[in-house]
């Protein structure tokens, strides 16, 4: 702002250099100098987002949206700083503890090794919620290797035991029929979260 106030924003780290260029080239020209009313920041941001989408209609897609996400989080941070309040209180919540889960990004690991890894995180770091990978990333229905999904869906939950939350991420591997089939396996093994089937 003109008085030196600022807010920090966050965007996806994937190809952040491209998103930063889009922010400066395709978002900033339409938002610089715009006023955000602290009384109704959501409406003002939606107007700004609509303006960017109208002016940059030839460039729809994830990079413009990622840049807008960075702007959105920066504006909320700015409003929180100006009000002297945490952002959570501005959006109707209350600051408090945030539960974390241990997330594995690995698919090149055997189900037994993954189970051992996650059990160590439980025992050494105190995690009580875990997410691991099934399928192959954007795998067109193929597994990382034949039978891995079936094996890991049984092995990891059995090793972790009861009293912990178990989640999986398929990263858009499965088509509808296989996604449903895997979903039933997950349900049978106490896995309660199924991300990007």
Predicted segments — roles?
Residues 2-82:
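Metal- or metallocofactor-binding catalytic centers and their adjacent structured scaffolds
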Residues 11-13, 88, 96, 139:
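Short, electropositive, low-hydrophobicity segments enriched in small/polar residues
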Residues 17, 79, 91, 138-140, ...:
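Active-site-proximal flexible loops/turns
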Residues 36, 88, 96, 165-166:
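Secondary-structure boundary/capping residues
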Residues 46-49, 91, 115, 180:
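Generic structural signal for individual residues within well-ordered alpha-helical segments
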Residues 66, 72-108:
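Glycine-rich, aromatic-flanked loop segments that form ligand/cofactor-binding clefts
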Residues 97-197:
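Metal-dependent enolase-superfamily TIM-barrel catalytic cores that perform enediolate-based chemistry
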């Amino acid at each position: 702002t003109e008085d030196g106030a600022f807010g920090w924003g966050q965007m996806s780290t994937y190809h952040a250099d491209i998103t930063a260029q889009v922010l400066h080239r395709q978002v900033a020209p339409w938002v610089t100098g715009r006023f955000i009313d602290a009384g109704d920041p959501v409406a003002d941001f939606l107007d700004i987002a609509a303006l960017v989408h109208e002016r940059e209609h030839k460039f729809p897609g994830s990079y413009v949206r990622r840049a807008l996400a960075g702007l959105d989080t920066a504006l909320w941070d700015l409003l929180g700083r100006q009000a002297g309040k945490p952002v959570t209180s501005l959006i109707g919540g209350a600051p408090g503890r945030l539960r974390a889960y241990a997330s594995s990004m690995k698919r090149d690991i055997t189900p037994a090794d993954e189970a051992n890894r996650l059990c160590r995180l439980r025992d050494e770091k105190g995690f009580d919620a875990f997410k691991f990978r099934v399928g192959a990333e954007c795998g067109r229905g193929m597994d990382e290797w034949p039978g891995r999904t079936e094996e890991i869906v049984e092995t990891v939950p059995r090793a972790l035991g009861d009293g912990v939350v178990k989640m999986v991420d398929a990263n858009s591997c499965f088509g509808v029929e296989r996604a449903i089939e895997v979903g039933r396996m997950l349900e049978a093994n106490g896995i309660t979260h199924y991300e990007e089937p």
